[in-house]
């Protein structure tokens, strides 16, 4: 099984990016959660508008599915400017970036998703553009080549990344504002589910919103995906009404348990306990035991399990915690 196949995957699936636009908030006041980020951004935006300046360049980082793209669009909307969107892997040549920069209007937003995947050549073009609003372009080839400078209108670059540590220092230092998005509390996710249901004209109870929220692994993208699948279940079997009972039945059918775990999560934790006596177990042995690639364990399965206190990473290997034993209804063996 690969990450994209999981109902609780944090990656956007198929046309989800397009579907989610209908339920995305457009104003900071409608943005649920991340209170410190929202408070700071409201001040920064208001100050920039009072000075009639472009907003400082903004770096947004955090785990996938937490609303980095949504926040970028809100910033542009609040500033009353256009937003042009691209991603690091798409910008293969310096000319691709130059074309986008020269088409910006004053104070516009250029949003680059996965900015950590920019090539060094693209970064070199970005440095003077971000710092001096200038674009250095090479004209001609060989000995006849020469560099010319083009003035750019003041603009805001918003970069989004799940790996802030992978950004080069020169690029990271050019962002005047840096915001980290954290996993959401269940209460905030419950509000997000209720808001999304309202946007989709769904009949849903408060308790059903809560049942979906607490299985969403702190991630709005997962919450909205589960809501759509629960809606399908309710449309077919419960006349379109999403109650606590129908939500629980749908989530059981989807194999998402109360902790937000699916089959793969349980398989990994169970292997650590049953096959390796709770650990420590090396990553390669664990990967062989559950039939998955070690990269899948490191990048997909482990982060949430560690963050929730179900798995511990030690110098000697992975270990199950007391919480894991309680989850399976087992008693931890002591030597």
UniProtKB/Swiss-Prot annotation:
UniProt-annotated stretches for the region Small ATPAse domain (RuvB-S): 185-255
Annotated segments matching region Head domain (RuvB-H): 258-335
Top-rank taxon, per record: Bacteria
Residues the entry annotates as binding ATP: 23-24, 65, 68-70, 131-133, 174, 184, 221
Positions that bind Mg(2+): 69
Region of interest: Large ATPase domain (RuvB-L): 4-184
Location in the cell: Cytoplasm
Pfam families: AAA_lid_4, RuvB_C, RuvB_N
SUPFAM superfamilies reported in the protein's UniProt record: P-loop containing nucleoside triphosphate hydrolases, Winged helix' DNA-binding domain
Chain positions recorded as DNA binding sites: 294, 313, 318
Molecular function, one GO term: ATP hydrolysis activity
Parts forming coiled coils: none
EC class (word): hydrolase
Keywords tagged on the record: ATP-binding, Cytoplasm, DNA damage, DNA recombination, DNA repair, DNA-binding, Hydrolase, Nucleotide-binding
EC id: 3.6.4.-
GO biological process: DNA recombination; DNA repair
Catalytic activity as recorded in UniProt: ATP + H2O = ADP + phosphate + H(+)
Description of its domains: Has 3 domains, the large (RuvB-L) and small ATPase (RuvB-S) domains and the C-terminal head (RuvB-H) domain. The head domain binds DNA, while the ATPase domains jointly bind ATP, ADP or are empty depending on the state of the subunit in the translocation cycle. During a single DNA translocation step the structure of each domain remains the same, but their relative positions change.
The protein's role, per its UniProt record: The RuvA-RuvB-RuvC complex processes Holliday junction (HJ) DNA during genetic recombination and DNA repair, while the RuvA-RuvB complex plays an important role in the rescue of blocked DNA replication forks via replication fork reversal (RFR). RuvA specifically binds to HJ cruciform DNA, conferring on it an open structure. The RuvB hexamer acts as an ATP-dependent pump, pulling dsDNA into and through the RuvAB complex. RuvB forms 2 homohexamers on either side of HJ DNA bound by 1 or 2 RuvA tetramers; 4 subunits per hexamer contact DNA at a time.
Quaternary structure annotation from Swiss-Prot or TrEMBL: Homohexamer. Forms an RuvA(8)-RuvB(12)-Holliday junction (HJ) complex. HJ DNA is sandwiched between 2 RuvA tetramers; dsDNA enters through RuvA and exits via RuvB. An RuvB hexamer assembles on each DNA strand where it exits the tetramer. Each RuvB hexamer is contacted by two RuvA subunits (via domain III) on 2 adjacent RuvB subunits; this complex drives branch migration. In the full resolvosome a probable DNA-RuvA(4)-RuvB(12)-RuvC(2) complex forms which resolves the HJ.
Name of this protein: Holliday junction branch migration complex subunit RuvB
Organism listed in the record: Pasteurella multocida (strain Pm70)
GN (gene name): ruvB
């Amino acid at each position: 099984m690969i990450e994209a196949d999981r109902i609780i995957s944090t990656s956007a699936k198929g046309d989800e990016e397009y579907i989610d636009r209908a339920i995305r908030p457009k104003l900071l006041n409608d943005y649920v959660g991340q209170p410190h980020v929202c408070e700071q951004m409201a001040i920064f935006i208001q100050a920039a508008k009072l000075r009639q300046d472009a907003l400082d360049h903004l770096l947004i980082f955090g785990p996938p599915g937490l609303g980095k793209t949504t926040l970028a669009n809100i910033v542009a909307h609040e500033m009353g400017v256009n937003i042009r969107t691209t991603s690091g892997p798409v910008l293969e040549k310096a000319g691709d970036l130059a074309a986008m920069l020269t088409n910006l209007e004053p104070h516009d937003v250029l949003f680059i998703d996965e900015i950590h995947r920019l090539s060094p050549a693209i970064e070199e073009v970005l440095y003077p553009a971000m710092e001096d609003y200038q674009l250095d372009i090479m004209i001609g080839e060989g000995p006849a080549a020469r560099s010319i400078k083009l003035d750019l209108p003041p603009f805001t670059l918003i970069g989004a990344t799940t790996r802030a540590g992978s950004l080069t220092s020169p690029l990271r230092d050019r962002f005047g504002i840096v915001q980290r998005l954290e996993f959401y509390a269940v209460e905030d996710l419950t509000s997000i589910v209720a808001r999304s249901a309202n946007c989709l004209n769904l009949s849903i109870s408060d308790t059903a919103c809560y049942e979906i929220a607490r299985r969403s692994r702190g991630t709005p993208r997962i919450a909205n995906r589960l809501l759509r699948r629960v809606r399908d279940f309710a449309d077919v079997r419960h006349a379109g009404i999403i109650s606590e009972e129908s939500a629980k039945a749908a989530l059981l059918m989807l194999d998402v348990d109360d902790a937000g775990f699916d089959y793969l999560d349980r398989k990994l934790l169970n292997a650590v306990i049953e096959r390796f006596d709770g650990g420590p177990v090396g990553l390669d042995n664990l990967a062989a035991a559950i039939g998955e690639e070690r990269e899948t364990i490191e990048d997909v399965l482990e982060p949430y399990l560690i963050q929730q206190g179900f798995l511990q990473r030690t110098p000697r290997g992975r270990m199950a915690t007391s919480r894991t034993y309680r989850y399976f209804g087992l008693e931890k063996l002591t030597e």
